[in-house]
Amino acid sequence: MVPRRIVVTLLTAGLLVTGAAAPAQAAGESPEVTDGPCQYTETPDEPAARPVPLPRDPRHTPDHGTASTTLITNVGLIPLRLDRAQAPCTVQSFLHLVRRGFYNRTICHRLTTYPTLKVLQCGDPSGTGEGGPGYRYKDELPTDLPPAPTDPTGERDVYARGVLAMANAGPDTNGSQFFLVFGDSALRPNYTIFGSVRPLGLRALDRVAAGGVAPTPEDPAPVDGAPAIRTEIFLALPL
């Protein structure tokens, strides 16, 4: 099994989702799928980085109001506001993972400091960018983002500072990895936005961003890679 890498990466053609294709399902095997509207789908070829069951999927997904979660990290508290109206299936899954302790004692494995992509990516217990919860679910993509003024093609929109969104490996492959935007970023609107980072959390993100990306022997001044300031989520708490 070739693990997929869930990333948002910079290519000459533009910002795209990349990842190794998932292997074909063996003949006669059917993954488990929840029978509610979110249809959380088991991914046997990509097992969970940390054991967790499929989320509950009631006939009516809660789609009004907000919920709150706080990430307790070594760089400070990162309070999050989750928007059920904007992305009900995503919020339902995220809260499920929080309540199951999926994010506890995990690192934020990726920092990008490109002029047009400023995000911290978290949510993989393996710390490699290849791990997930052992299931996937559909996109709930934004439709009202302003166009990115720096993009002459008109294909990218602004994911503004403070946005909380899902990383993915292509259409309808959401799992557990998410990213926190610390500076306005230009992205194709292919990433589900499901909430926002509160001001206290943005201050913590700014501290991580100020430390930059950890240098490597191949690149002494990278703009994409592990944060120089190791960022660990000790505990994710639903409020």
Predicted features, each with a name:
Residues 2-9, 14, 19-239:
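Cyclophilin-like peptidyl-prolyl cis-trans isomerases
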